[in-house]
């Protein structure tokens, strides 16, 4: 933990490397408690229920952009009896995995199992506001961020990424105009 009890934030201590934003800590995977994050991020579902398919889709879209910026694989895990009907078969990739717990299992159980398996390969970050889950993840060797910290990091990373893309586009536009 950083001074003051907060966790270190990758954006504030990150640097650019080959077009990616590299966090100070090397992460093997980021595991997200999907409904915990949706509950803490009301802007994702301003006109629809927080646990709706539209809110989940927006969360997945933003996490995919965040994964594109950092390059660290992300698994977002939702409670439920499998994927909801109408969920596209290709919703997951290796870099952005979308998981739904099976009947009789919880997202927490899937996250704990993943932390146990991935921690032998390096640092695993879990995003949740569930205090019991946080304690379990820490006991398994994982690192935990609150949803609020993660939301701030995602928003900062996406703003920085958009600014860098805009800057790069302006540079290319000027370079192209000089050739004429």
Where are these regions (language model features)?
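N-terminal amphipathic/basic-hydrophobic helices that include classical n-h-c signal peptides
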Residues: 1-24
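Nuclease catalytic cores that cleave nucleic-acid phosphodiester bonds
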Residues: 27-32, 36-180
């Amino acid at each position: 933990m950083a001074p003051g009890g907060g966790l270190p934030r990758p954006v504030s201590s990150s640097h650019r490397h080959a077009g990616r934003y590299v966090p100070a800590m090397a992460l093997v995977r980021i595991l997200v408690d999907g409904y915990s994050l949706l509950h803490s991020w009301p802007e994702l579902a301003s006109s629809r229920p927080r646990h709706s398919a539209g809110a989940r889709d927006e969360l997945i879209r933003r996490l995919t952009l965040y994964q594109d910026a950092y390059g660290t694989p992300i698994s977002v895990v939702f409670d439920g009896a499998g994927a909801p009907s109408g969920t596209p078969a290709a919703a997951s990739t290796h870099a952005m995995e979308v998981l739904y717990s099976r009947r009789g299992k919880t997202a927490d159980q899937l996250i704990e199992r993943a932390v146990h398996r991935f921690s032998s390969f390096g640092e695993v970050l879990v995003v949740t506001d569930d205090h019991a889950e946080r304690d379990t993840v820490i006991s398994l060797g994982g690192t935990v961020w609150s949803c609020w910290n993660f939301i701030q990091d995602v928003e900062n990373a996406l703003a920085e990424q958009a600014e860098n893309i805009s800057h790069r586009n302006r540079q290319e536009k000027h370079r192209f105009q000089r050739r004429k």
